[in-house]
């Protein structure tokens, strides 16, 4: 009983903050024109979470849209217009007795998660006697189209892809293999979208698409 109490008393709790990664342009100054844009539909077109027993809620697409809006704003190249919370925004304007002065977007960004998957690989050393390991791998690919709101023309398109891997190894009874890590889904999706936004910014910088004068 004393031993159990001693072990319970030795439990420790730690925490730390982690700086989220940003798109490349977030760290560079910019004084040029910014595109007023909004984000339209962003759907999960991959087979992930779309099986026979799916509840029909597109959580992956919704997560991707949230990540995209964040990286677009942090890129310092766009005026990002919120179209998801129109009712709440209108209500707050009324509470302030102010008329809304909503901006219109020049472009709407639409996108899809075109590929998404998880896999696990493992190995053993001397039939597992000397150790064994497991690697969890997550892969994601997204496509984004820039659509002119007046003409419905797709003026620019980009793709982004990323892969995340988590490895653990147990050697002669020490260490342990990791259980399923669901955070890899968000990490690899963020990586792919961040890469796509980098390509969008590069397109502006080389004149492939640009704000209206």
Per-region residue spans from a language model:
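Soluble periplasmic/extracytoplasmic beta-strand elements of cell-envelope proteins
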Residues: 36-43, 67-71, 79-81, 106-114, ...
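Surface-exposed short loop/turn segments
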Residues: 12-13, 89-155, 165-179
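Sec-dependent signal peptide recognition
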Residues: 1-3
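Juxtamembrane/interfacial segments around transmembrane helices
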Residues: 155-157, 194-195
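A structural "domain/chain start" motif
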Residues: 10-80, 85-97, 102, 166, ...
């Amino acid at each position: 009983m004393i031993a159990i109490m001693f072990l319970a008393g030795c439990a420790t709790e730690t925490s730390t903050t982690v700086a989220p990664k940003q798109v490349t342009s977030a760290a560079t100054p910019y004084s040029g024109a910014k595109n007023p844009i909004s984000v339209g539909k962003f759907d999960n077109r991959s087979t992930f979470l779309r099986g026979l027993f799916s509840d029909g809620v597109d959580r992956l697409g919704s997560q991707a849209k949230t990540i995209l809006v964040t990286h677009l704003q942090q890129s310092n190249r766009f005026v990002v217009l919120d179209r998801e919370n129109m009712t709440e925004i209108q209500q707050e304007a009324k509470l302030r007795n102010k008329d809304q002065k909503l901006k219109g977007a020049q472009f709407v960004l639409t996108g899809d998660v075109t590929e998404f998957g998880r896999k696990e690989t493992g190995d053993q050393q001397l039939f597992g006697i000397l150790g064994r390991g497991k690697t969890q791998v997550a892969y994601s690919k997204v496509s984004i189209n820039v659509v002119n709101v007046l003409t419905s023309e797709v003026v620019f398109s980009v793709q982004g892809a990323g892969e995340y891997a988590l490895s653990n190894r147990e050697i002669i009874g020490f260490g342990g293999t990791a259980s399923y890590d669901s955070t890899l889904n968000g990490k690899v999706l963020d990586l792919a979208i961040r890469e796509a936004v980098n390509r969008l910014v590069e397109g502006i910088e080389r004149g492939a698409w640009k704000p209206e004068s």
